[in-house]
Amino acid sequence: MSLTNEQIIEAIGQKSVMEIVELIKAMEETFGVTAAAAVAAGPAAGAAAAVEEQTEFNVVLAEAGDKKVNVIKAVRELTGLGLKEAKEKVDTAPQVIAEGLTKEAAEDAKKKLEEAGAKVELK
């Protein structure tokens, strides 16, 4: 049975950010490709170098704050980790919660964690 593009997109849309990151890594390994965007040719010699904007972000839990239970729930939601693993990450902050996210996905993850009471950094 073959899936339509719409079915694939719908299935991906129901996954968490961390599940999508894992899917991308698996696809890169399976097909021997990278998901990195193609790099355009650099400026001509003598031209001023353009400042390159960061495209991949890591979400770092700096501190759990007072609402530790809410932060653990948010970490579980974002990562798909079990209760024990999420609690260990929160208890041993600072910890990287998600790696290689787009700016929008990283800001969404940061917002969820901050709403739960955590202090978060994007790197």
From Swiss-Prot:
Domain of life the protein comes from: Bacteria
Keyword Transcription: no
CDD domains the UniProt entry points to: Ribosomal_L7_L12
Gene3D superfamilies membership: 3.30.1390.10, Single helix bin
MF terms in GO: mRNA binding; structural constituent of ribosome
Gene Ontology annotations for the cellular component aspect, listed alphabetically: cytosolic large ribosomal subunit
Function noted in UniProt: Forms part of the ribosomal stalk which helps the ribosome interact with GTP-bound translation factors. Is thus essential for accurate translation.
Subunit structure: Homodimer. Part of the ribosomal stalk of the 50S ribosomal subunit. Forms a multimeric L10(L12)X complex, where L10 forms an elongated spine to which 2 to 4 L12 dimers bind in a sequential fashion. Binds GTP-bound translation factors.
PANTHER family found in the cross-reference section: 39S RIBOSOMAL PROTEIN L12, LARGE RIBOSOMAL SUBUNIT PROTEIN BL12M
Protein name per its UniProtKB record: Large ribosomal subunit protein bL12
Source organism (scientific name): Ectopseudomonas mendocina (strain ymp)
Gene expressing this chain: rplL
